[in-house]
Each structure stands twice: as structure tokens, then as C-alpha cells.
Regions:
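Catalytic-site microenvironment of enzymes
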Residues: 1-242
């Protein structure tokens, strides 16, 4: 298992200039509701480590769009953009994967066994830090194509996870999807990482690959950058208010 960790700008402050520059690079200069960018957070030795997970990977492609674009690549692309934004802003960031791979233990045979090992190793990374905020990036799918929009899932295992989910939902509504009425949703053991993570954790379903219009957006580099910035803003809002 490879635990990928990058640490920069220890003790730095997320300045308004840096925050605005990241927003501009993502093509999102202003909050659509009130004309203001979300609150930035001051980085200190007590600031949580940000742990990012790109769902699926390797032989596990996740769901796919109608034209065959797999979820795993979209998840990873958003994660890499988000990691850069966070690191530029001074956060310490850990990722479960930064390539198209499963992180199961070597020597494990069989798809089911590899998947189980992969999830165990992701959870170990989530729980490796006593002070962390964990985000698992995914895409949604449904049998009917009309459904669209991001949705946040959290577990009651950590009492702060609900607040993180609300901050993330608020960020998506303010910055990217003003008409999104999807409520945050509490999960059970079926969402393994969320349920068993000891840190505040949210699974961000960024959109529906079963919706052709949203799938086309999610496959585009420009929209992925906007999604990454929206998640970045949700994290910053949560930490600033904690």
C-alpha cells in the first residue's frame, strides 16, 4: 500500500489573494448568490490534515456514462485538481491514490478479495491521522436519466460529519448548482469509508453519469476544476467555522 502524502507551507495563512487566485483559475470568481467568495481558513499547526479519496481505480471502474466514460478517471481528475488547490493554500494533504490503480495489498488474488483489501487500506489512510477531514469523491448513477446534481453522504459515527456535509452542500448550492435541492443523507455500513472513518468524513457524489448533460460536464476539464473548487470551498468553510 502506498500512502501518498504532501506537506507544504507549514503554518501558512490562506490569504484572500491566494483564495481569489484559485477561484479565478477554476473560472469561479464570485459567489452566485451574494457576489462574495466563501470564507477562507487560517492555517495553523492545529488545522486538520485533508485526506482525499478518489473512488474506485484500477480494474474497478465504478459506474460509467452512456458513452462509456468511467467514473474512476473523473474522480481522480477532480482529486488532483483539488489537491493542488489545497496545497497551494497551505493545507497538508494526503490522498489514497494519485494514479489509476487499486491500492490492495500485493499478493491478493480474486476481484472480491482485492476490493476488500483496497477498501481496508483506504480506511487505514482515513484513520491514520487523529486530526483530519476526509473527502471521498464519487459520481452517481440511476436507472432513469433525468436525475442530476451533487449529493453529500455522511455517517453519524463522527458528530462533525453532518456539519461537513452541510458545508459541502452549501458550497455546491452557492457556487455551482443553485437549483440543487438534494438534501444531505446519512448513510449506514453500506458506505464503508464514511461509516468506519473516525474523522469527519463526507462522500461527495458530484453528479449523475446517467444524465447525458451532466455526464458531458463531468467529463470536461473546465467543469472538473469548478467541482474541485466547490469542494475546496466547502472544506474551507467547514474549517473556518470549526
Amino acid at each position: 500500500m502506498k500512502n501518498v502524502k504532501r506537506m507544504i507551507f507549514s503554518g501558512a495563512v490562506v490569504s484572500v489573494c491566494a483564495f481569489s487566485a484559485i477561484a479565478a483559475a477554476a473560472g469561479m470568481n464570485r459567489n452566485k448568490n451574494d457576489g462574495e467568495l466563501p470564507a477562507s481558513a487560517k492555517i495553523s499547526k492545529d488545522t486538520p490534515v485533508i485526506v482525499l479519496d478518489a473512488g474506485h481505480g484500477g480494474i474497478d471502474g465504478g459506474c460509467s456514462s452512456a458513452d462509456g466514460v468511467p467514473e474512476k478517471g473523473i474522480n481522480l481528475s477532480i482529486l488532483l485538481k483539488l489537491r493542488d488547490m489545497l496545497e497551494i493554500s497551505g493545507y497538508d494533504v494526503v490522498v489514497t491514490r494519485d494514479t489509476d490503480t487499486s491500492i490492495h495489498d500485493k499478493g491478493i488474488e480474486g476481484i472480491a478479495q482485492q476490493k476488500s483489501s483496497d477498501m481496508d487500506n483506504r480506511l487505514a489512510i482515513f484513520n491514520d491521522n487523529d486530526n483530519a477531514v476526509c473527502i471521498s469523491i464519487h459520481q452517481n448513477q440511476f436507472t432513469q436519466p433525468q436525475y442530476h446534481g451533487a449529493q453529500m453522504f455522511y455517517s453519524a459515527t463522527n458528530p462533525e460529519s453532518e456539519s461537513l456535509a452541510r458545508a459541502m452542500k452549501s458550497s455546491f448550492t452557492k457556487l455551482l448548482q443553485p437549483d440543487n435541492q438534494r438534501e444531505i443523507k446519512q448513510c449506514g455500513k453500506e458506505l464503508f469509508l464514511c461509516y468506519f472513518s473516525k474523522n469527519p468524513t463526507v462522500m461527495v457524489e458530484c453528479g449523475f453519469l446517467s444524465n447525458p448533460e451532466e455526464a458531458a460536464l463531468l467529463a470536461s476539464d473546465e467543469y472538473q476544476a469548478k467541482v474541485a473548487f466547490t469542494i475546496f470551498s466547502g472544506i474551507s468553510e467547514f474549517i473556518a467555522s470549526s
